Amino acid sequence: MIDAKSEHKIAPWKIEEVNALKELLKSTSIIALIDMMEVPAVQLQEIRDKIRDQMTLKMSRNTLMKRAIEEVAEETGNPEFAKLADYLDKGAAIIATEMNPFKLFKTLDESKSPAPVKGGATAPCDIEVKAGSTGMPPGPFLSELKAVGIPAAIDKGKIGIKEDKVVVKEGEVVSQKLAVVLSALGIKPVTVGLNVLGVYEDGVIYTESDLKIDEEEFIGKIQKAYTSAFNLSVNAVIPTSATIETIVQKAFNDAKAVSVESAFVTDKTADAILGKAYAQMIAVAGLAGDDALDEELIEKMSSGAAAPVEEAPVEEKKEEKKEEAAPAAGLGMLF
């Protein structure tokens, strides 16, 4: 906190700003630091409009944000929160929200938009100008195109580009003249938006590399892990709330199969045992001659009235598939 001895040395507006930042930092459970250094004013306003209802964005001086973070950490007895100040960089700003870090990152990433490249900037990729009409009438722009190495000529009363041309390769510096031409052609090779520096949640600070994940791959891994754990629980007979029903069903089916195979009669297996014995009798009778059989058995064999063998149903796989779908149910909440 700013003490009384030093207050007279600090501009009142700075004290008010730090206090306002502290209120913001205490207002939500999720606090993010974002970099908005390279975001033009027009794009920044568009982004603000997109995220206004989901989070609060506040810009300030890095020194004041650092002080506010450290004071909140001290006042709340939370030294882990103070580490968030280590992520202050460039043109940082604070976002306060209740949105979980992964969903916050996705929302900010989706709010990014294409923008023209600035002169003196490094090309983020190979920048190519496509052949075709520019839609512009003959004039000075024709000379500007040629000056930056773009083959152009008048075609049907309009300035046209003769062929596809890579005007700057990834990693090269874009000249001011080329930047002006690309902007005039409506080419926007740069993606601008709010980049995450660090997100604090419940004692943990996430960086962009932590939050930038392939959702389908991530969910697939969780589903695979769940399936493996489910099968291990069933096969090792380690009951859980998710597997107890399948374990009991598997045990019942295994016991029933043993009972039938060993001819150990129970009220659950009597029919299956008798059916199996009957089928075996008919099979043996079929190998014997008619002289060895009585008339009733011969009649049954000729009519094909052999009783079907009842087999113990195997249901655990069906149940496994039913259970496997469960882990995906709540994963959407992360994103």
From Swiss-Prot:
Disulfide bridge positions per record: none
GO cellular component: cytosolic large ribosomal subunit
Chain intervals with Basic and acidic residues compositional bias: 314-325
Gene Ontology biological-process annotations: cytoplasmic translation; ribosomal large subunit assembly
Domain of life assignment: Archaea
GO molecular function per UniProt: large ribosomal subunit rRNA binding; structural constituent of ribosome
Stated role: Forms part of the ribosomal stalk, playing a central role in the interaction of the ribosome with GTP-bound translation factors.
Subunit structure: Part of the 50S ribosomal subunit. Forms part of the ribosomal stalk which helps the ribosome interact with GTP-bound translation factors. Forms a heptameric L10(L12)2(L12)2(L12)2 complex, where L10 forms an elongated spine to which the L12 dimers bind in a sequential fashion.
Protein name: Large ribosomal subunit protein uL10
UniProt lineage: Archaea, Methanobacteriati, Methanobacteriota, Methanomada group, Methanococci
Recorded name of the encoding gene: rpl10
